[in-house]
């Protein structure tokens, strides 16, 4: 039987996976490429070019009112399609209307407001917010923490990039170290139960997976904040336990802020900004704070 030709989006996915880009990048690029095609009434991209790209990007800025970062994201996805998938060089100087970069001052909470919000949370969500505020981690960095990244002896946390390489080291507050140890004891029991059921593997960046073939089953590579459920990997089909989904924490935070009756625009980055501000207020020099971030 002859195999059917692959659809364009499947070709995009193949190239992204060959380059070992993250699953989030794959979803984002696929989303914008589909939007681009639908905007031009399902015309095939190989029959379009600079003029159509500019029209799409202009519409995003003028009619959709997207942020500059969103417009750039769409542009990168489309350029990837032409260069890496269609192998089509574009003589493109983008003359589209550019979305305006929004200038905003980050929200900073007082120490009392941080405590009030933390008190509205419980369990894994409360521990995660304590960690984000106490370390200056981004939400994605906190969710992607592995057991081996936590150094209780030195009271440090290793932060890794998307390829699993060490990018920086930040502090682990002594005030939450014991609570984190107890949490990891519970996580270890869950991991052992998963292994007994024939599961227990965890996602690893490609370079790490290739170098350490059995590492995905090892305790040290498990996520510090695992999901409550095992699920099927959308790329490989392997059933395993991923980390807690960011939407779960964001929903819990939103409810906590409402319960705390704090009238500020608060998101996951707020605790990172507050961490840095409070360190400076406590006498840390700005160079040290920048290194921790």
How would you name each of these model-derived features?
Residues 1-293:
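Conserved catalytic core of the tyrosine transesterase superfamily
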């Amino acid at each position: 039987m002859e195999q059917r030709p692959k659809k364009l989006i499947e070709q995009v996915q193949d190239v992204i996976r060959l380059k070992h880009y993250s699953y989030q990048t794959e979803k984002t690029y696929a989303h914008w490429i589909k939007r681009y095609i639908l905007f031009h009434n399902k015309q095939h991209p190989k029959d379009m070019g600079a003029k159509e790209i500019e029209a799409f990007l202009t519409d995003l800025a003028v009619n959709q009112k997207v942020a500059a970062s969103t417009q750039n994201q769409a542009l990168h996805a489309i350029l990837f399609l032409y260069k890496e998938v269609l192998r089509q060089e574009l003589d493109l100087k983008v003359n589209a209307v550019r979305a305006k970069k929004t200038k905003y001052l980050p929200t900073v909470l007082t120490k009392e407001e941080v405590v009030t919000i933390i008190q509205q949370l419980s369990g894994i969500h409360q521990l995660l917010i304590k960690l984000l505020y106490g370390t200056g981690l981004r939400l994605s960095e906190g969710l992607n923490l592995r057991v081996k990244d936590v150094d209780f002896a030195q009271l440090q946390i290793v932060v890794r990039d998307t390829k699993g390489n060490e990018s920086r080291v930040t502090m682990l507050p002594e005030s939450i170290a014991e609570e984190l140890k107890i949490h990891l004891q519970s996580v270890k029991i869950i991991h052992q139960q998963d292994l007994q059921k024939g599961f227990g593997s965890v996602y690893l960046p490609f370079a790490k997976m290739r170098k350490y073939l059995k590492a995905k089953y090892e305790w040290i590579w498990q996520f510090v904040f695992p999901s409550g459920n095992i699920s099927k990997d959308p790329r490989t089909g392997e059933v395993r336990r991923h980390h807690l989904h960011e939407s779960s924490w964001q929903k819990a935070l939103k409810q906590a802020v409402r319960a705390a009756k704090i009238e500020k625009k608060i998101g996951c980055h707020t605790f990172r900004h507050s961490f840095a501000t409070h360190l400076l207020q406590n006498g840390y020099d700005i160079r040290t704070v920048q290194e921790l971030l």
